[in-house]
Amino acid sequence: MAKESYKREKPHVNIGTIGHVDHGKTTLTAAITKVLSEKGQAQKMDFDEIDKAPEEKERGITISTSHVEYETPSRHYAHIDCPGHADYVKNMITGAAQMDGAILVVAATDGPMPQTREHILLAKQVNVPSIVVFMNKVDIADPELIELVEMELRELLSSYGFPGDDIPIIQGSALGALNGEAEWVGKIEELMEAVDNYIPTPVRDVDKPFLMPVEDVFSISGRGTVGTGRIERGVIKINEEVELVGIRPTKKSVVTGIEMFRKLLDQGEAGDNAGLLLRGVNKDELERGMVIAKPGSITPHTKFKAEVYILKKEEGGRHTPFFNGYRPQFYFRTTDVTGSVNLPDGVEMVMPGDNLSIEAELIAPIAMDEGLRFAIREGGRTVGAGTVTSIIE
């Protein structure tokens, strides 16, 4: 019996390998599982198993991603690795695999390459909080070059708003570690220590301010109006004050009942599908697409900047480019809102398969904060995906 008290849940952290093609992301992922499996902290996965990533659909977009799990003495990790550059772009923009931190893999033989830059920029845009660097292939690189690459990397990271001078850069050889060479195995252990210590533990959804997107609205005669949906974050208790945000003017209310699977509860929390009974709200004051949230925690907006990915024709996207003033629907949480797209200076048109920064203006306000994901749709068909990077008004 006494054993039970030691069973503490380790904090869970989502990470991924990012970086230029052929710099060793997948080899590193395989090396991490091999080194940790020898301590009983992972299931060893070979390069080929990780490389043939299964396809998944997220917001109508097909993405190939490999998921690997492992643990260190202090944490449990879910690690993603993507086979192709486009999969990374799609993954980061759709938030299909939310990353709490990333391991940037850079080959010492090449230094930073175009996709290295693009992945750092994307990580910044979509709010990946921190990066640890693994400089790979140092066993076959010129020692003087290694020093230059490290300086260049620190400058590059700083130029995109990451703390380049403080970021841990571990020099190693993923292949050497995979082959069991002691010197390089030690570097994988050093990398995991850096990831443990440098990437902050994320705030759990339950600990964030309460928010539930409204999926459906019912009225119960004599009792009031019920909004149903899946609680996205936080905890709600009976008699707590909430705000109804988005589409219409913001309105305050009090939750007088919480129902889940036809049972009455005294509280609901992140992940629960619940119905909230709201005091003093008419059925026509609440609709799908609004959110019920902790007062003051989120505000409605119509103008924002976003990083978007536009699907290729083969992915079911548009067959033709679009131009400034393009008016699709933006699908936020549970509903579509029409909006217009303003392209950056110097961009004449956007081709299927492109990713870029845009400004958008919606015809109705939506509850939003930075990092909110959305789909871009035309007549119910997904043609792109995006992340809100900043709010204009």
Curated annotation (Swiss-Prot):
Region entry G3, spans: 81-84
Residue intervals of the tr-type G domain: 10-203
Enzyme Commission number(s) from the entry: 3.6.5.3
G1: annotated span: 19-26
Binding sites annotated in the UniProt record for GTP: 19-26, 81-85, 136-139
Binding-site residues, Mg(2+): T26
CDD domains, alphabetized: EF_Tu, EFTU_II, EFTU_III
Keywords, sorted A to Z: Cytoplasm, Elongation factor, GTP-binding, Hydrolase, Magnesium, Metal-binding, Nucleotide-binding, Protein biosynthesis
GO cellular component: cytoplasm
Region (G2): 60-64
Top enzyme category: hydrolase
GO molecular function annotation: GTP binding; GTPase activity; translation elongation factor activity
Assembly: Monomer.
NCBIfam families, per the entry: EF-Tu (TIGR00485), PRK00049.1 (NF000766), PRK12735.1 (NF009372), PRK12736.1 (NF009373), small_GTP (TIGR00231)
Job description of the protein: GTP hydrolase that promotes the GTP-dependent binding of aminoacyl-tRNA to the A-site of ribosomes during protein biosynthesis.
Record protein name field: Elongation factor Tu
